[in-house]
Swiss-Prot record:
Gene3D superfamilies: HUPs, Isoleucyl-tRNA Synthetase, Domain 1, Methionyl-tRNA synthetase, Zn-domain, Nucleic acid-binding proteins. Residues 570-670 form the tRNA-binding domain. GO terms for biological process: methionyl-tRNA aminoacylation. This is Methionine--tRNA ligase. Is required not only for elongation of protein synthesis but also for the initiation of all mRNA translation through initiator tRNA(fMet) aminoacylation. It catalyses: tRNA(Met) + L-methionine + ATP = L-methionyl-tRNA(Met) + AMP + diphosphate. It comes from Legionella pneumophila (strain Lens).
Length: 670
C-alpha cells in the first residue's frame, strides 16, 4: 500500500524549562496516532518537533540554578526525548529552537518582512528593574490591583476581580525577580504589522484550514481588530539577536514556530530530502500543525501571516485540542494530580494512557478528562478483558495441542470478512482525528470475536479428543480475528502491536496486510501482552506526584527592602480573624473567582476569592481559614466583597491558609 501524498506534521514545542506532564502528552499522543495511521497507509508522512528553548523564564531559571541557559535547555531536551520514547511517541526528528538552522531561518524571515515593509518600529514604555537591570515582562511585576485594591496581583490581570490592565497601572508595583520597585523606561521595539494581512487571514481561516469552533473564535478577534505584534525584546534575554540592532532580540514567539521549519531543515540536511519541496509557496505537499487551544492565536493568525509575508507556504490545517483535566478539575500539585510523565512511568504502562486518551479524543476542541475509575475500567475491560483475552485463550491451545501451527482454513470466513469490512470506517475515524469513534468500532468488533469464542467453547471441546479438529479451527479463527483487531489498534498501541507481530510470527502489520489470513502458519509461544491495571499503582503514582512536586516547589523569596518596612502600629491596623467557610460557590462568568460566605462567630461576611481553579466548592465548605476582617468593602460586578482570605502561592498553585486545631471562628490572629 503506497501513496504519492507527502505530509509534514508537527506538534507544539514543549517549553524547555521543566519536565513533561500528562497535559503535554495529550497532544503528542494525538499527533503520534495520526502520523502512524498515515504511515500505515503508505503515505510519506514526516513528523518533527523540538524544544522551545528561548525566553526570560529559561534565562532566569538557569541563573537560579547557577548554569547557562544552553546547559539547562540541553538537559531538559534529553528528559523530553526520553519521556517521548517511553510513550512510543516517535518523531522523525526532534530538535531545539536554539539551533543554527532556526537562527538562519528566523533571520531570513525577519529580513524578508523588513524588506516588504511589514516591520514597524515604535517607542514603548515599560517597567524596568533597576537592580537586575532588565525590562520586566508582565508576569514578572506584582502589585495592588488598580480596580479592586487586591494585593499581590500580576502585571497583566487581577486574580481577585478579573480585571485586565497594563503593568504600569499597578499600585505599589514590585519586581518579582529582585523585589525592587520598578521604574518606567522607554525602549524602541520592532512590530510585525499584522493588520496588513487581515483580509488574507480572514480568507485563510474560512477555507477549512481550522475546526469550526476555532474559526468562530477567530471571527471575534477580527471584530475586535488585529493589532501590530511586538516581536522584539531587550537585553538581557536568552534568544537570537536581531541582526544589526544592539541589545535587541527576537521574541520567543517569533522563532518558536519557525522551529518547525528548523527541525525539518535539520531532518532534510541529514537525509537528503528537499526542504523547498515542503515549504515553498507553490508546494504541493501537505503541512499540518497540532496545537492546544491556548496558542491558537499564534498559530492561526501570526504564523500564517508571517509565512505568507515572507514567501513561504501556509499550513494545510491547524488542528486544535482542549486541555487535560484530572477527575474533572484542573491539574493540581496539592492534590497530586499534576502528574509528570516520569511519575506516571514509574507505576503504569505507557500504553494504558495512549489507549485512554485515544478513547476520549474526538477531533473537537473539547477538554479531555482523566478519570481514574474510568481509566481502570476501560483498560481492564477493553484491552485486557476483550482484546488480549482473545489471543491468550486461543494461543494456549495452539501452542500446547497443535505444535504452534494454525489450521489450513477458516471455519467462519463470513465473520472474518465482517471484521475486515470495518477497516475503512476505522481508518476514516483515525484520519478524522475522531479516535473515540475508531475505538468504539474496534471494541464492537472485539465483542463479536468474544461472542464467537464463547459460543463455541473450545475449552469444553478440548476435553473430548474427537473434537480437537474443531478446537483447532476455532482457535485458528480466533487468532486471525485477533490479528485484525491488533492491526486496527496499531496506531494507538505500537508496543503491543510489535509484541503481537512477534507472537504471530508475521511481518509488520498494516492496513492492507490483513486480507489474507494466516493459515497452516506457525506462531510463536504466547507471552502476556498486557496486564490489568491495579488501583494501588494509581494511588502510589498520585502520592509520589504530590510528594515530589510539593517538596521541589519554587519558594517565593522576595527580598525585603528597607523602604517596604512597616511599623507594628501599621500592622496592628489589620484585623485578622479565624473564619469558617459556611458556603462556597464558583462565580459564573469569572475564570478564577469563588464566592465565599465566612462565619466570624458573631457575624457572616461575603468574600470573593481568586481560588476557583485551585479548589472545588464542596471541599471548602466547613473548613477554617484566615481573613482580613476590616478591609473596606468593595463593589465588584458580581457583588460586594467584605474582606479577603489569606492564601500562599508560588506562581503555579494557590494554597489557602488553615489554622491549627483549637482555633474557632472569630478568634483574632495576633
Amino acid at each position: 500500500m503506497t501513496s504519492e501524498r507527502k505530509m509534514l506534521v508537527t506538534s507544539a514545542l514543549p517549553y524547555a524549562n521543566g519536565h513533561l506532564h500528562l497535559g503535554h502528552l495529550v497532544e503528542h499522543i494525538q499527533t503520534d496516532i495520526w502520523v502512524r495511521t498515515h504511515k500505515m497507509l503508505g503515505i510519506q508522512c514526516i513528523s518533527v518537533c523540538g524544544d522551545d528553548a528561548h525566553g526570560t523564564p529559561i534565562m532566569l531559571k538557569a541563573e537560579q540554578l547557577g548554569i547557562t541557559p544552553e546547559a539547562l535547555t540541553a538537559e531538559i531536551k534529553l528528559s523530553h526525548e526520553k519521556d517521548f520514547k517511553a510513550f512510543a511517541i516517535d518523531y522523525d526528528y526532534y530538535h531545539t529552537t536554539h539551533s543554527p538552522e532556526n537562527q538562519a531561518l528566523a533571520t531570513t524571515i525577519f529580513e524578508r518582512l523588513q524588506a516588504g515593509g511589514d516591520i514597524v518600529k515604535k517607542t514603548i514604555r515599560q517597567f524596568y528593574d533597576p537592580v537586575k537591570q532588565m525590562f520586566l515582562p508582565d508576569r514578572y511585576v506584582k502589585g495592588t490591583c488598580p480596580k479592586c485594591a487586591a494585593v499581590d496581583q500580576y502585571g497583566d490581570n487581577c486574580e481577585v476581580c478579573g480585571a485586565t490592565y497594563s503593568p504600569t497601572d499597578l499600585i505599589n508595583p514590585v519586581s518579582v525577580i529582585s523585589g525592587a520597585s520598578p521604574v518606567e523606561k522607554e525602549s524602541e521595539h520592532y512590530f510585525f504589522d499584522l493588520p496588513r494581512y487581515e483580509e488574507l487571514l480572514k480568507d485563510w481561516t474560512r477555507k477549512g484550514h481550522l475546526q469550526t469552533e476555532v474559526t468562530n473564535k477567530l471571527s471575534e478577534w477580527f471584530e475586535a481588530g488585529l493589532k501590530q505584534w511586538d516581536i522584539s525584546r531587550d537585553a538581557p534575554y536568552f534568544g537570537f539577536p536581531i541582526p544589526g540592532v544592539p541589545d535587541k532580540y527576537f521574541y520567543v514567539w517569533l522563532d518558536a514556530p519557525i522551529g518547525y521549519m528548523a527541525s525539518f531543515k535539520k531532518y532534510c540536511d541529514e537525509r537528503g530530502v528537499s526542504f523547498d519541496e515542503f515549504w515553498d509557496k507553490t508546494s504541493k505537499t501537505e503541512l499540518y500543525h497540532f496545537v492546544g487551544k491556548d496558542i491558537v492565536y499564534f498559530h492561526a493568525l501570526f504564523w500564517p501571516a508571517m509565512l505568507a509575508a515572507s514567501g513561504f507556504r501556509t499550513p494545510t490545517a491547524v488542528y486544535t485540542h482542549g486541555f487535560l483535566t484530572v477527575e474533572g478539575q484542573k491539574m493540581s500539585k496539592s492534590r497530586g494530580t499534576f502528574i509528570e510523565a516520569r511519575a506516571y512511568l514509574a507505576h503504569l504502562h505507557p500504553e494504558y494512557l495512549r489507549y485512554y486518551f485515544a478513547a476520549k479524543l474526538n477531533g473537537r476542541v473539547d477538554d479531555l478528562d482523566l478519570n481514574f475509575d474510568d481509566f481502570v475500567n476501560r483498560v481492564n475491560a477493553d484491552l485486557v478483558g476483550k482484546v488480549v483475552n482473545i489471543a491468550s485463550r486461543c494461543a494456549g491451545f495452539i501452542n500446547k495441542r497443535f505444535d504452534n501451527r494454525l489450521s489450513s482454513e477458516l471455519n467462519d470466513p463470513k465473520l472474518h470478512n465482517d471484521l475486515l469490512s470495518a477497516r475503512e470506517s476505522v481508518i476514516d475515524a483515525f484520519v478524522s482525528r475522531d479516535y473515540a469513534r475508531a475505538i468504539r468500532q474496534i471494541m464492537d468488533c472485539a465483542d463479536k470475536v468474544n461472542q464467537y469464542i464463547d459460543a463455541n467453547k473450545p475449552w469444553v471441546l478440548a476435553k473430548d479428543e474427537s473434537k480437537l479438529n474443531e478446537v483447532h479451527a476455532i482457535c485458528t479463527m480466533g487468532i486471525n480475528l485477533f490479528r485484525i483487531l491488533i492491526t486496527y489498534l496499531k496506531p494507538v498501541l505500537p508496543m503491543m502491536a510489535k509484541a503481537s507481530e512477534e507472537f504471530l510470527n508475521s511481518e509488520p502489520l498494516h492496513w492492507g496486510s490483513i486480507d489474507k489470513p494466516l493459515l497452516n502458519h506457525r506462531i510463536n509461544t504466547f507471552k502476556p501482552l498486557m496486564v490489568r491495571v491495579e488501583k494501588e499503582k494509581i494511588e502510589a503514582m498520585l502520592a509520589q506526584s504530590k510528594e515530589s512536586l510539593m517538596t521541589t516547589q519554587t519558594k517565593e523569596n522576595t527580598p525585603v527592602e528597607d523602604s517596604n518596612l512597616i511599623s507594628i502600629e501599621d500592622f496592628a491596623k489589620v484585623d485578622l480573624r479565624i473564619a469558617k467557610i459556611v458556603n462556597a460557590e464558583p462565580v459564573e462568568g469569572a475564570d478564577k473567582l469563588m464566592r465565599l460566605i465566612l462565619d466570624l462567630g458573631d457575624a457572616q461576611k461575603q468574600v470573593f476569592a481568586g481560588i476557583k481553579k485551585a479548589y472545588d466548592a464542596e471541599e471548602l465548605i466547613g473548613r477554617l481559614t484566615v481573613m482580613v476582617a476590616n478591609l473596606e468593602p468593595r463593589t465588584m460586578r458580581f457583588g460586594v466583597s467584605e474582606g479577603m482570605v489569606l492564601a500562599a502561592g508560588d506562581g503555579q498553585g494557590i494554597y489557602l491558609l488553615q489554622p491549627d486545631a483549637g482555633a474557632l471562628p472569630g478568634m483574632k490572629v495576633k
